[in-house]
Amino acid sequence: IKSLAFLILFAGCSYDNCNIKTNESFKQITVQNLITDIYSVNNLSSFNSFLLENKNVLYPFYEVEDTSFLLDKVANAFTLIDNVYFDSLYNDVNTHFENPLNLFYPLDNSFTKFNQQSNYKLSPNITILISGFFNDIIVDKENIVIGLDYFLPKTNKYKPRDLPSYILDRYSPEHINSISLSSYLSQFNLINESDLTMINEMISFGKLYYVVSKLLPCTEQRIILGYSEKEFELVNKNEAFIYSFFLQNELLFEESNLIKQKYLSERPSTFEISQSVPGRIGRWLGWRIVSSFMDSSTYTLEELLKEDDYKNIFYNSNYNPI
């Protein structure tokens, strides 16, 4: 596989033919807009009623449970919308997402495409609201709940304060669909949990990235991977070097969680390789391996997600960028 020094655009798609009709009904998803509803809440009692009316999606979103701590949890969540900044946040969301339903037509197309070749028939309900930066996205098999305020442009005055910049960079409008789809499909992405090797986890991440890229063909691969243009260009140019590093340091079959997290977890850089190599590089490498496997595989996307034997993918990938 030749390393690529440019942004990958998948076959059959260019940004010129990615104009998606936004005046049609959704085919696979439903979208519930609670932005105005939550803005209308003006006291703790009405907030509690609002949560109860949408209990199946908002209790999990606000991490509220029917326990003795219920009222404390509700009161704590209410403080995030009962403050002087919430009006500004509401105005910002309405300004930047004038018609928020239009955001999700690519996601609807994704589920349409997936369902056409799958025994799964996935038709989640999407709920959008302003969370006061309580939560970004939660999912279950029937729902995707999105705190739209998390995805305001990076230049917006109000952004979450508890996230480092290398993570916050991914919370932008262009990332909404890829993060939503990745989060949702992760529920169907099987992995052999008894196998502790790094390559097992790398392949699992790679499967998810690959499936999302095929379902969102008009989203740049760097967006799906969560890299900047500069980072994506760098890792593609240095693919052979990065893979050689993994081989020379015998990382693929490493089982130490501490070591694995250096290459799989959120970090500003993978310092062990180079200061300029971004974090989560093991996930990116897993995507390259899975992509090589799928070049000659007859697997459907559903079958790929269900494949929990990394050996089948790894040893049949013929991956060798060196």
Model-predicted regions and their roles:
Residues 14-85:
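N-terminal mature-domain "stem" immediately C-terminal to a signal peptide or N-terminal signal-anchor/transmembrane
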Residues 26, 99-106, 196-203, 234, ...:
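Extracytoplasmic/periplasmic, Sec-exported soluble proteins
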Residues 37-41, 110-113, 117-120, 214-218, ...:
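Structured segments of extracytoplasmic/periplasmic soluble domains
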Residues 77-232, 302, 306:
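Acidic/His-rich structured neighborhood in mature extracellular/periplasmic domains
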